[in-house]
Amino acid sequence: TKLTSDKLFVAGNAYSGEHGTRFSVVRYGNVMGSRGSVIPFFSSIREKGVLPITDERMTRFMISLEQGVELVWHAFEDMVGGEIYVKKIPSMKVTDLARVVAPECKQEVVGIRPGEKLHEQMIGAEDSYYTFEYPEHFKILPTINEWASSPERIKDGKKVPEGFVYASDNNGEWMTDAELQAWIDTNGEKIGSI
């Protein structure tokens, strides 16, 4: 559903009419503490002494609300229309997060649910042809007209290699237990409840 909504928004640029409305998209990982987030879920059941883990290999991107808002503001300032902005953020293993949130709990592997993915993919190989890297984010340019080769859109971006994939399992930056704990401590008051 996310991919479909991205494509619909980007395609909306071709139908903006005389008003010239432009649409761009931001992609990022799970917002820490948002409704249904795993951190408040783990916290709410830690008294049982066991945390359910879908799969020991599962990885995720996690972003604070502030980081998400910063990316949205950057997109507003930078966009021409049709771009997809992807925030660079570290990956984490769900087992590491469970250990940090509730170190006293056992972890029980419960199996993957239908439709659930082991890893989050933010940029697929098919997007690599139109993706540019910047210090804080990636930008996937639209394939409409010659928009993907427009210097106005590329600016100082560096083209990613053909076949590039940005996913939570192949990310070069990983959160250690200490970094996860510091991150939770810093953002703890913003972690919501289910």
Describe the residue ranges of each PLM region.
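Active-site helix of classical SDR
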Residues: 1
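Strand-loop microenvironment adjacent to phosphate/nucleotide-handling motifs in alpha/beta enzyme folds
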Residues: 6-194
